[in-house]
């Protein structure tokens, strides 16, 4: 079982239950899924860029990415409807817990000048979004094997009903929030 999932069951869930006065154990906030997205705008001109991004994403998450296509044509960006413009992976279950553990304990501390993640990136419904400037912070990515440095978006979807519950859940799981 994932180390973080164990910690959730042993320490985090009971603490959340007590803090928010939750009686029903099924109402305790937990992680639902983590969506990792990599937008590759250059893929419109060069399809090899998308292959590199998909390879990186597969290495980081341990799961095959899904190609995301443009929903509509935008002449200014030279994009036609249906052109591949990015890659996405939805993580659930064990892989989700393993990924979050690696993100918190290995990847984020490797970010240059890291002072913590923004405590304001909640969406009002208990979900957290985080942007990473370069994929090189993940230990699975070797600096020499990368064709270009790309950023990625990470959306952490929780069952929490409020931002306060979600913030407390992530804080107890070890998410390093920047002090306000």
From Swiss-Prot:
User: What does the record note on quaternary structure?
Assistant: Part of the 50S ribosomal subunit; part of the 5S rRNA/L5/L18/L25 subcomplex. Contacts the 5S rRNA and the P site tRNA. Forms a bridge to the 30S subunit in the 70S ribosome.
The GO annotation for biological process reads:
translation
Q: What is this protein called?
A: Large ribosomal subunit protein uL5
What GO annotations for molecular function exist for this entry?
Answer: rRNA binding; structural constituent of ribosome; tRNA binding
- NCBIfam families found in the cross-reference section: PRK00010.1 (NF000585)
Q: Keywords, A to Z?
A: Ribonucleoprotein, Ribosomal protein, RNA-binding, rRNA-binding, tRNA-binding
What is one GO cellular-component annotation here? Answer: ribosome
Q: Which organism is it from?
A: Rubrobacter xylanophilus (strain DSM 9941 / JCM 11954 / NBRC 16129 / PRD-1)
**Entry's InterPro entries?**
Ribosomal_uL5, Ribosomal_uL5_bac-type, Ribosomal_uL5_C, Ribosomal_uL5_dom_sf, Ribosomal_uL5_N
- Give coiled-coil spans as residue ranges: none
Family the UniProt entry places it in: Belongs to the universal ribosomal protein uL5 family.
In its keyword annotation, does this UniProt entry include NAD?
no
Function text: This is one of the proteins that bind and probably mediate the attachment of the 5S RNA into the large ribosomal subunit, where it forms part of the central protuberance. In the 70S ribosome it contacts protein S13 of the 30S subunit (bridge B1b), connecting the 2 subunits; this bridge is implicated in subunit movement. Contacts the P site tRNA; the 5S rRNA and some of its associated proteins might help stabilize positioning of ribosome-bound tRNAs.
PANTHER family according to UniProt: 60S RIBOSOMAL PROTEIN L11-RELATED
């Amino acid at each position: 079982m994932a180390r973080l999932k164990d910690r959730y069951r042993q320490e985090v869930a009971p603490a959340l239950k007590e803090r928010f006065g939750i009686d029903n154990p099924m109402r305790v906030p937990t992680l639902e899924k983590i969506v990792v997205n990599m937008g590759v705008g250059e893929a419109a001109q060069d399809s090899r860029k998308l292959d590199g991004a998909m390879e990186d994403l597969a290495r980081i998450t341990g799961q095959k990415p899904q190609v995301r296509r443009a929903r509509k044509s935008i002449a200014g960006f030279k994009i036609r409807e249906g052109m591949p413009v990015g890659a996405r992976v939805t993580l659930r279950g064990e892989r989700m817990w393993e990924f979050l553990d690696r993100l918190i304990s290995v990847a984020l501390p490797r970010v240059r000048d890291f002072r913590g993640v923004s405590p304001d990136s909640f969406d009002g419904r208990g979900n957290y979004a985080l942007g990473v400037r370069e994929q090189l912070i993940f230990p699975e990515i070797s600096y020499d094997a990368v064709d270009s440095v790309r950023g990625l978006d990470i959306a952490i979807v929780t069952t929490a009903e409020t931002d306060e519950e979600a913030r407390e859940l992530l804080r107890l799981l070890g998410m390093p929030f920047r002090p306000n």
